[in-house]
Amino acid sequence: MSYITTSKLSRRRIRNRKRVLIVNCYFDYTRLSVPRPFKSPQAMAPVYLAGAFSDELVDIRLYNEQSSGPLEDENLLSWPDMLVLTGLTSAFDRMLHLTAYARTKNTNVIVVAGGSPIRAIPNYSQRFFDYCCCGDIEQMNEVITDAFGEDYVAREMLPRYDLAYWTRRFGYIETSRNCNFRCPFCALTGEGVGYQKYDLEYIRKQIIAMGKKKYVIFIDNNFYGNDRKFFLERLDLIKDMRKAGYLRSWAALVTTDFFHKDENLELVRDAGCLGLFTGIEAFDTQWLQNNKAQNAHFPQVELISKSLDAGVVFHYGLIMDV
């Protein structure tokens, strides 16, 4: 390729560059305008979505309202050609706010919304957003192709950890998607999605792209899953990456069936696991039985003690505290 041709190509790329702002929308549980930079885990959907865009043709900025508080920067809201919004179900109204603000600054801005809020009310959402995405993050590729053209889609979709200003000492990795259980009170059950495993090489690439971190949190809905071979393969991969210096300790979310095999605690501890989170849901056994919590293990206090005795910190959530 000649120098002149290269220059023309460079000028054309500069002229055709797009600007994309990806926001994790967040309503704090206190309903106050406060940042939660030390809350864990932090939202990572914007980081994964950013990986869908070509870094050669797209300037990307990320904003996490969970970590940084409500987005109120008028200059930032007027900047993008495309505004991509994601978040938890409770953030739907916040999506509406940001859409209205952005359109007052730029009437031509393309607004893309996805995640749990859109899957919960897909038809209603179409009144407000240009693109309503009910699928997984890969659907972003289709949106980019339709809105900008296929040249603006990344050759390989890897999370853009370099843009994740809020992660600090922590790294966040996803090795699987959704859950193999169907508890009636769970949002994943309502969405009707199935458990999906990631390719081990893709997991390795995520860790390398993340860079070296002291602590890593695996943000899988269920790190244990229903495939023991896959579980053991990931532990071996984690050991390899620890030896290479990419992480020192890690934590993950598992369902309580993980604790049925005593050896599991030894396996994760030997792989550098610092702590596990699981849904105790309630200390009322009758309530759990009535609500058909499929992964419940009794008695709950014994389960907690077993984890602590093995040297693994036990974190748990409650739906009902009595």
Region spans (language model):
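Radical SAM [4Fe-4S] cluster-binding motif and immediate context
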Residues: 158-315, 320-322
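Acidic, low-complexity intrinsically disordered segments
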Residues: 2-211, 215-217
